[in-house]
Amino acid sequence: MATTNSSGRKLFGPVYRLKGCFGEDSLMISDPVALQHIINSPHFEHGPLLENVIDMLFGKKSLVSAKGFSASAVRSYQPVLLRAAQELSERLEDSCAPASAVNVCPLLGNATFNAVVQAGLGCSTQDLGEEFVANNSQIVALSSSQSAPHIFAIGACLPSWIWRTMIYAPVAAFKDIRTAKYLTHHLGAKIVRGKLDSARQGLEINTDVFGILLEQYLGGKTRHALSEEEVAAQFSALVYPGQDPTANTIVFGLLELAKHPEFQEKLRVEIQSNPGASYDTMPLLNAFIKVCGTVRFATVDHNLSIAQEVLRLYPAAALIQRIAVHDAVIPLSDSIETSTGQLINQIPVRKGQVLTLAVASYQRLERYWGDDAQKFRPSRWLDGTITSHGPALGPYANLLSFLGGPRVCLGWRFAVLEMQVFFSELVSKFSFALSEDDFVRMRFSGALIPVLPNGSEKAAPMWITRI
């Protein structure tokens, strides 16, 4: 379980020093008070790795506006997610065979890809063309490969101008990235033109993220509205981060359900007890409304508790880089002992210091999540194991799976609803069991991904039975 950094925390504590690329000093941090300070302080920005990757893949203008992911906007995307989940069910039915396991990774990847394209851009993946769909598969595969993180880790220490030069290197990975940048720029502009033409004809366009942003632009009611060019630039920032991380998290959730058939059945009973009910009376929708309204919940149903538990154990971004842009002092929850025996309750850092936020390790702290924090136990969210003590961190259930502060993932409501819809659809129609021959493991490859025991192939084979 090295990907969660829990072993390092148990050996050295919630803050310790380690060597990074080319021998530079870095701090590994899972202390909640320190994490809260770092994610909210203007003295810390994206680390060099993330900053360079964002620039290379997405460009400087690709900062998604929060307008398209407000609580009301996300509610309107629920039919899109339901259709995507139902289409996934149909594909699973076609894939199920009595004597063979099904690898759910590509199926879920395609489903989340379809969902984010429909909700974000207002079109289907087929509308984007075969070339983009094929290139998207290459980009997703690149993010899951073993070699790519090694390239990016070294590249994190290089100046930005070298990164901009590297993209033109005659390497297959960089060729795919060049193609992706061209296609996303072209398609983003094409979709914007189409929506603006529809708006001029009096047609409604505010049914997806792009449409909402363009309606704001056309209305001219706020100085924060994005221009046509800026809306088009959101294409890559919507599509790429909105598919694979959520798909991987859902895969890990299905694997945990397969390991815990008793809980799987309990969840199934809860879902199936509301056939044909109105949205207002469905536990799934009520859980969604609670999520949109507050981080503290008066009641939590089983479907929400599994979403929370999966996000706690399997955050897509298990490790996150930050860099100090000014000299700063980081406060700590408890005093720690230095190598010289001195007790300190804060850590001074210099400008340029690289920090690694150990999100997965924080979300396994026994103090906050219970003595069995390493285990999958959704009931911890129902039985009072988890209390509200400690600093408030992320936007959802005090988890950092979506980060927090000014750099919070703006699509967190969409991701949570997507998980709830997919789990409800799949668990109500299928039974999931582990494949006897394959034991799926975690690997950190820029994000947590499921892999086979050999560690080189992303896959999650399971026995799936139609109920």
Name each model-derived stretch.
Residues Q126, P261-F263, G394-P395, V408, ...:
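Cytochrome P450 heme-binding "Cys pocket" and the immediately downstream C-terminal segment
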Residues I29, H37-I38, D244-R268:
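Classical protein tyrosine phosphatase
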Residues M1-K67, V80-R91, A111, A180-L183, ...:
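N-terminal membrane-proximal hinge/A-helix region immediately C-terminal to the signal-anchor transmembrane segment
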Residues L319, S339, L357-H389:
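Conserved cytochrome P450 K-helix/beta-meander segment immediately N-terminal to the heme-binding cysteine loop
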Residues Q78, L82, Q138-V140, E204-G211, ...:
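Cytochrome P450 I-helix active-site segment
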Residues E230, Q234-D244, T249-V251, I344-Y362, ...:
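C-terminal, well-structured subdomains that either form a transmembrane helix-short loop-helix hairpin
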Residues A180-T249, G384:
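Conserved cytochrome P450 catalytic core segment spanning the I/J/K helices
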Residues K19-S26, V74-R83, E93-Q118, D127-N135, ...:
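Cytochrome P450
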